Curated annotation (Swiss-Prot):
Effect of loss of the gene: RNAi-mediated knockdown causes variable hypersensitivity to low, chronic doses of the B.thuringiensis pore-forming toxin Cry5B but not to heavy metal Cd(2+) exposure.
Pfam families attached to this UniProt entry: Arrestin_N (PF00339)
GO biological process: protein transport; response to nematicide
GO terms for cellular component: cytoplasm
Gene name per UniProt: ttm-2
Family: Belongs to the arrestin family.
InterPro entries hit by this protein: Arrestin-like_C, Arrestin-like_N, Arrestin_domain-protein, Ig_E-set
Function (record text): Involved in resistance to B.thuringiensis pore-forming toxin Cry5B downstream of the sek-1 and pmk-1 MAPK kinase pathway.
Protein name in the entry: Protein ttm-2
Induction record: By B.thuringiensis pore-forming toxin Cry5B.
Species of provenance: Caenorhabditis elegans
Length: 358
């Protein structure tokens, strides 16, 4: 049975990039005197694939399909080891005339562990591999990537206590930045029986946007359907795809974000052509990202037309790209610069402001 210990982990930053050193310290407060001779840190990263539920799945009666997990990183490092004063000075070992190694009697009788009766502080220093992918989690996504730092306390080879701390990893190499914007002008006609139709035209000055940017577009709808159109909705669709090791898509989930509708007009009458410019800002979404062999996220701008939100006649999507600033050219991070899909620990040595979207 593991001992009850209160752990407080304090790290030097709220997130890390591949190749950086995770530094900080951990404070251990035992409920009773505790002997420790070694403290290790275990860096663990895994990807989890979630199977999507079929439309006719009975949530109350049938169990959820199991998820599949693959370990990406499993690294260990010794953070602290008990040493006597003689051991630190190298005085505990001597050699005879045959160069045989012997321990002094003082060292042999000394304790091999340290007894802690109050809070003890141990350093943290462990390398994050350069190939580490970014942390990722989004409700409804077919895939998630999670990193943890486990602090393990040992005495005479037995693990007596442990604690896991979540880590956030950002990998800017997988984020699209060098994208050439281009204007978008598309027309689409949706045909119905008895020569009825709905025509849609949309003009976009660019197909590349930054987070929270104003989306300037013009939508024109020509209604030749049998009834008036009371529902026109504009929003961004997020598409998350899980990839296998050959970079092939094995599962995709579409997530609709909030959007806007007709600005003031209540309906588009039969035979009427109506143009409007909706007031719409890009939601606080992470940028397009592609992590080889793991996952990718893409976006599209969707226009939905119908009589009501539950009476949709037609919809059309146009691919767009959401980008972020080039962080490698900045010496300091600003609050509005970082948007990722993960929740971070609040235990940081310096409270660097950062938006972490769960």
């Amino acid at each position: 049975m593991l001992d009850k210990i209160r752990f407080t982990v304090l790290l030097d930053r709220p997130f890390y990039q591949p190749g950086q050193t995770i530094q900080g310290h951990v404070v251990c407060e035992p409920h009773h005197p505790l002997e420790i001779d070694c403290v290790e840190g275990r860096l663990h990263g895994e990807i989890q694939y979630f199977q999507q539920l079929p439309p006719n799945h009975n949530r109350n009666g049938s169990p959820l399909p199991p998820s599949k997990t693959r370990v990406l990183i499993d690294e260990k490092a010794q953070l602290w080891k008990y040493q006597t004063v003689s051991e630190m000075l190298g005085l505990d070992v001597f050699y005879d005339e045959n160069q045989n190694r012997h321990f002094s009697s003082e060292s042999a009788s000394a304790s091999s562990s340290s007894l802690f009766t109050t809070a003890a502080t141990f350093p943290i220093q462990i390398e994050l591999p350069h190939f580490a992918p970014p942390s990722f989690y989004c409700p409804g996504s077919p895939v998630s990537i999670r990193f943890t730092l486990e602090i393990q306390l040992y005495n005479q080879g037995f693990k007596i206590a442990s604690h896991e701390e979540n880590l956030v990893v950002l990998n800017y190499e997988s984020i699209k930045r060098q994208v050439t914007p281009k204007p978008v002008n598309f027309q689409k006609t949706f045909n119905f029986p008895k020569e009825r139709s709905i025509s849609l035209e949309m003009l976009l000055p660019t197909d590349v946007f930054t987070t929270t940017a104003r989306l300037e577009n013009c939508i024109t709808i020509c209604n030749r359907w049998k009834q008036s159109l009371k529902y026109v909705h504009l929003n961004i669709v997020r598409r998350i795809s899980a990839l296998n090791q050959n970079n092939e898509v094995i599962d995709t989930v579409k997530i609709d974000t909030t959007g806007v509708g007709l600005p003031s007009k209540t309906k588009i009458a039969v035979g009427e052509t109506y143009s409007f410019r909706p007031t719409f800002n890009v939601p606080a979404l992470p940028p397009n990202i592609h992590v080889n062999g793991l996952f990718k996220t893409e976006y599209s701008l969707k226009v939905t037309i119908g009589r009501a939100h539950n009476f949709v006649l037609a919809s059309y999507e146009v691919p767009i790209t959401i980008v972020t600033m080039d962080q490698s050219s900045r010496r300091s991070m600003q609050k509005e610069d970082i948007l990722v899909d993960i929740s971070a620990s609040n235990n940081t040595l310096n409270n660097l402001p950062v938006d972490l979207l769960a």
